[in-house]
């Protein structure tokens, strides 16, 4: 995502909690003359018009934004903070309030599309916040996305991402069961996928994960650990708003089984490992 911003002509300052990753980015793109590294989030944010963040969870997010050396302490008034972390709606709203007090705009903007989407500039960005700030950052976000949409007020981006993860959980489990059934039935599952992907069963998961599931390949993509983190956020939010998510809760436990099998870093499509 940072590379797409840089290659679109913007000046970029990068910070990573693993310094070697920031240095590797500098080594790869330093010859553009528009990139530098920072040693703290605060330093990275100093003088920036827009600050983008993307970390692991609520705790990490609070640390890099609100800590003594956090980004917010380095941001000038009228700067816009855009957070791409998949986090809770609660922390999105809390950050919005902190930013308002500091004279800074905040957009919660989780993404969908995985590593491939980020690398190819084809992410989907779902945003929550105020319209004026969103309109300013949308052209920047389009450098690494194919869609960037304002879903509502602060927190709406995170709530939309939760809907996304609920749908993925059910789709991947259904796809895994279908493939496992077909294999037990002695069908050529690659041929089956070619056929049914042209009908009503077609999905992104089928197109991009079906054949790797057949081939028992899972050493890529979106890790099971991260999916469980996301589903935990979903299930906690469902307890607050009264939504009933029986299938999502069940699939979350199936992912726990995959973790016990040693699949913490396997792609989410590894749900099929429980069935074969």
Predicted segments with their positions:
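Hydrophobic residues within alpha-helices
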Residues: 1-5, 95, 140, 181
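NAD(P)+-binding Rossmann beta1-loop-alpha1 motif at the extreme N-terminus of oxidoreductases
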Residues: 1-53, 78, 84-85, 115
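Short phosphate-binding/catalytic loops that engage adenosine nucleotides
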Residues: 10-11, 104, 187
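A short helix-to-beta-strand connector/capping loop
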Residues: 30-36, 102-104, 146, 243
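Rossmann-fold NAD(P) dinucleotide-binding segment
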Residues: 41-105
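Rossmann-fold dinucleotide-binding core
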Residues: 55, 86-166
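Active-site-proximal catalytic alpha-helix in oxidoreductases
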Residues: 121-128, 149, 153-185, 196-208, ...
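Interdomain hinge/lid region at the active-site interface
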Residues: 154, 202-268, 275
């Amino acid at each position: 995502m940072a590379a797409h911003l840089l290659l679109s002509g913007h000046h970029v300052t990068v910070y990573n909690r693993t310094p070697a990753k920031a240095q590797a980015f500098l080594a790869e793109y330093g010859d553009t003359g528009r990139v530098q590294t920072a040693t703290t989030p605060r330093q990275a944010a100093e003088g920036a018009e827009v600050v983008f963040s993307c970390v692991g969870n609520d705790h990490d997010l609070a640390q890099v934004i609100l800590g003594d050396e956090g980004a917010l302490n380095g941001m000038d008034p009228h700067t816009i903070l855009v957070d791409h972390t998949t986090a809770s709606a609660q922390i999105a709203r809390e950050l919005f309030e902190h930013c308002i007090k500091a004279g800074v705009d905040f957009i919660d903007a989780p993404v969908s599309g995985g590593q491939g989407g980020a690398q190819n500039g084809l992410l989907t960005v779902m945003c929550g916040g105020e319209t004026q700030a969103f309109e300013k950052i949308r052209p920047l976000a389009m450098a690494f996305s194919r869609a960037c949409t304002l879903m509502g007020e602060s927190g709406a981006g995170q709530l939309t991402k939760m809907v996304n993860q609920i749908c993925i959980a059910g789709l991947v489990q259904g796809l895994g069961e279908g493939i496992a059934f077909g294999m037990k039935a002695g069908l050529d599952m690659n041929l089956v996928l070619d056929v049914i992907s042209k009908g009503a069963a077609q999905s992104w998961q089928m197109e991009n994960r079906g054949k790797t599931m057949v081939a028992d390949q899972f050493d890529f993509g979106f890790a099971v650990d991260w999916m469980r983190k996301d589903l935990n956020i979903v299930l906690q939010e469902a307890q607050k708003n009264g939504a009933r998510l029986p299938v999502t809760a069940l699939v979350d436990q199936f992912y726990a089984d995959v973790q016990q099998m040693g699949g913490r870093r396997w792609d989410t499509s590894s749900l099929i490992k429980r069935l074969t």
